[in-house]
Amino acid sequence: RDLHLLSRRQRQMCIRDSLGETSTLFRNEDSGEMHGLIRVRQFTISEGHLVLRPDQLEDEFRDCLDLAKYCLGTVGLLDKCTFRFSQWDPANPKNKYEGTKEQWDHAQSVMARILKDLDVDYTIGIDEAAFYGPKLDIQYKNVYGKEDTLVTIQIDMLLAERFGMYYTDENGEKKLPYIIHRTSLGCYERTLAYLIETYAGALPTWMAPEQVRFLPVTDRAVDYCKDQAAKLTAQGYRVTVDTRSEKIGKKIRDAQMEKIPYMLVVGDRDIEAGTVSPRHRADGDLGAMTLDAFTAVLKDVVDNKLKK
């Protein structure tokens, strides 16, 4: 069981709190279950834990779902995602789940109502719940058709009592809060694997690890390329210079094979004119232009997160 939850004492009137961390986790997966970056024994995840009253549950759940949909939509994965309402198996309560049937029925009815109110189209997964409560899993299929969970939002009805977490309501009565456990992008390694699959390695410019590569035609152009590259780097772009003594055709082919979004070819004419000659990996030659003009093109693509 994986659980990272920090608890702390609060004033009794404090009835909503949220805690979060980005951490490295370890899970002893069977060797036959491991698969590339999709299922690994060591992974990184950003988690949030929201401690709240029952009447806050729906609004907070909605915010968690909106956050996950925004993140997945921004990176281009949401369109292929499906939603699964993961429930307990009442026939197998003692081996996997904690809590009473009444607690589970209540938690699942609350979640069902929330999903209905939010108009979420989902399937039901029996025996897929966490040991402490039901959850909404955002699922994604890999290129082989196998479905994995990208993001999960869990309603926890049990751990607050175990950790001695209570709040005092408006009537002065001691009550147990709910806890929502949520992620926004899920396991980084798995999400990265699906991004690589989805884009066939050609990640959009705004998320590409290398956005621009300068390709000097001759050694005479290397210093000019380095000066121009430094200007882009200073603006926050990820830029390299190919200083190898190779023919320009090979440099272009290598950059294409490595799926570099923009290649800036620089020859003697560019040095004399103070220009660069950009190529896009999909659109080809864009024609000679000043570095400022190219920067404007790059800024538009990156700032608007265009899928090119």
Label every PLM stretch briefly.
Residues 39-101, 126, 206-214, 233-234, ...:
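Conserved alpha/beta enzyme-core scaffolds, especially Rossmann-like or related mixed alpha/beta domains
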Residues 23-55, 81-88, 163-178:
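Residues forming anionic-ligand binding surfaces in small-molecule and nucleic-acid pockets
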Residues 17, 21, 25-31, 126-202:
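A translation/RNA-centric and nucleic-acid-associated enzymatic feature enriched
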Residues 73-153:
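Metal-assisted phosphate- and nucleotidyl-transfer catalytic regions
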Residues 199-253:
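Generic long, charged, amphipathic alpha-helical segments
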Residues 229-297:
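C-terminal structured "cap/appendage" subdomains that terminate the fold
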Residues 26-38, 61-79, 107-111, 115, ...:
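Structured alpha-helical segments in the cores of large, soluble enzyme domains
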Residues 1-11, 15:
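Single conserved hydrophobic/aromatic residue that forms the stacking wall/gate
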